[in-house]
């Protein structure tokens, strides 16, 4: 990696930026909109599902955190896969993560269109997607501080809104003003806590995982963070509190306020529940917050996709032109290329306005599975390398190596679940073809480089 290129990135993200980005990073469409599909599959037991998936996500982020604290680089786990596993692993994980972020960008833009239609049903989803596409990408071309400030305030809004919703919902329950249908017994009174059995919960796990996509954002910010040794461990350890407050507590209140079997699909259950309680003002405000959350996640994934493309270019796995960084510290070409591909979302929403979000969500989950498996496997190789060198790490992961194998087994189980679900099967079937395309592209890249390159130092260890 060119030190000059790396040095041109600005350390414009302060401790408050990193902490709030990490704290608010998982509050997005997966919680507010994706939850409707998981409720349909599992009922109240999705609360347990989010707890299980959140625990796996926490274990894996500790694995990534251990590597990032040792080497705070822009390529994140793609860099680590390249260095500790081999060149193709870095090539595959980097491009897969870039595609993942582009897909998440598309999903968030699709969701933004649905939220706008809550107020103005006549506005097509593609029009809303195009508007926010232009706005966010324009801002991201200015300076990394603008990204940090936007995410900081977006996260403040999301966090305060979630806490207010929990508080207001708890007040309604405690005072009995939420109506006769509101009761904690909603968690078990309607066909039990597992209305569709354990099978229902298992089938919902693939949808639940979508909510945790993008949780790796802290790793991408490492190269532009000040004092990464201090800020990054704090950001990682916050994940467990995010899960308990933003998912478990929120869903507990939601299910208590309204019977789960009356929550309609297509929109946000949160908005629908408060609207049904004659709290139209609260529902309108909540829809604004949910819209803010979707814009926030789109902003973050736009940032991630451009920085991953920059890292790939610095590794030689993408055209060198994408490694150029302007005087403001922005990888302009990487931002523009990522944006150009993301704009396909506008076309997708124009052709499939009602199915775009669901299709993109399943593709995102498949890409998440690949990336999380790569992170856990790369971490195994990272720890073995550190042990051979006789070095200890500053921020060791939990339960190594058991947690690595547990995370990988869980993610492979998600693929099995998706393959058994007709609506999700196509995403799983695309994975072998996608990896084959990456293998062909990698071989093409190697043949294009005529001069023989030195053997990768750590590849020789393999």
Where are these regions (language model features)?
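TM-loop-TM module centered on a large, flexible mid-protein loop between adjacent transmembrane helices
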Residues: 79-81, 86, 118, 235-301, ...
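Membrane-helix boundary/coupling elements in multi-pass transport proteins
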Residues: 73, 96-110, 212-225, 280-320, ...
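Membrane-interface "cap" regions at the ends of multi-pass membrane proteins
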Residues: 1-36, 41-45, 57-62, 71-74, ...
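Extracellular loop-to-transmembrane helix junctions
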Residues: 10, 33-128, 132, 239-242, ...
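C-terminal membrane-solvent junction of multi-pass transporters and transport-like membrane proteins
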Residues: 153, 321-332, 369-422, 452, ...
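Helix-loop-helix connectors at the membrane interface of multi-pass transporters/channels
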Residues: 2-6, 79-82, 108-129, 161-164, ...
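Helix-loop-helix junctions that connect adjacent transmembrane segments
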Residues: 4-10, 46-47, 124, 156-288
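Membrane-interface loop-to-helix entry segments
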Residues: 113, 126-182, 213, 236-240, ...
């Amino acid at each position: 990696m060119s030190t000059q290129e790396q040095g041109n990135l600005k350390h414009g993200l302060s401790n408050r930026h990193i902490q709030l980005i990490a704290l608010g990073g998982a509050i997005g469409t997966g919680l507010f909109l994706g939850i409707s599909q998981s409720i349909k599959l599992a009922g109240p037991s999705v609360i347990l599902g989010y707890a299980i998936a959140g625990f796996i996500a926490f274990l894996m982020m500790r694995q990534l955190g251990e590597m990032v604290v040792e080497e705070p680089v822009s390529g994140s786990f793609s860099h680590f896969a390249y260095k500790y596993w081999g060149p193709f692993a870095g090539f595959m994980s980097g491009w897969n993560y870039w595609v993942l972020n582009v897909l998440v960008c598309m999903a968030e833009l699709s969701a933004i269109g649905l939220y706008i239609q809550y107020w103005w049903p006549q506005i097509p989803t593609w029009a809303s997607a195009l508007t926010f596409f232009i706005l966010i990408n324009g801002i991201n071309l200015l300076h990394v501080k603008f990204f940090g400030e936007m995410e900081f305030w977006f996260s403040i809004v999301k966090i305060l809104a979630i806490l207010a919703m929990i508080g207001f919902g708890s007040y309604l329950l405690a005072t009995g003003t939420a109506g006769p249908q509101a009761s904690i017994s909603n968690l078990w009174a309607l066909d039990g806590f597992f209305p569709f059995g354990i099978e229902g919960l298992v089938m919902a796990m693939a949808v639940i995982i979508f909510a945790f996509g993008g949780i790796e954002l802290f790793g991408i910010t490492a190269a532009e963070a000040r004092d990464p040794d201090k800020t990054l461990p704090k950001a990682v350890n916050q994940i467990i509190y995010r899960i308990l407050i933003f998912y478990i507590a929120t869903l507990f209140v939601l299910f208590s306020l309204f019977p789960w079997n009356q929550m309609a699909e297509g929109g946000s259950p949160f908005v629908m529940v408060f609207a049904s309680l004659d709290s139209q003002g609260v529902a309108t405000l909540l829809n604004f917050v949910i819209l803010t959350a979707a814009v926030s996640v789109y902003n973050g994934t736009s940032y991630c996709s451009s920085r991953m493309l920059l890292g790939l270019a610095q590794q030689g796995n993408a055209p060198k032109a994408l490694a150029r960084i302007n005087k403001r510290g922005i990888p302009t070409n990487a931002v523009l290329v990522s944006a150009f591909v993301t704009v396909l979302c506008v076309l997708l929403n124009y052709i499939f306005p009602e199915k775009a979000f669901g299709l993109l969500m399943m593709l995102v989950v498949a890409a998440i599975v690949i990336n999380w498996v790569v992170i856990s496997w790369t971490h195994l190789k990272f720890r073995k390398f550190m042990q051979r060198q006789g070095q200890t790490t500053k921020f060791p992961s939990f339960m190594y190596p058991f947690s690595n194998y547990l995370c990988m087994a869980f993610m492979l189980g998600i693929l099995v679940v998706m393959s058994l679900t007709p609506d999700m099967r196509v995403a799983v079937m695309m994975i072998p073809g996608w990896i084959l395309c990456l293998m062909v592209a990698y071989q093409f890249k190697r043949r294009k480089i005529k001069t023989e390159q030195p053997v990768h130092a750590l590849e020789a260890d393999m």
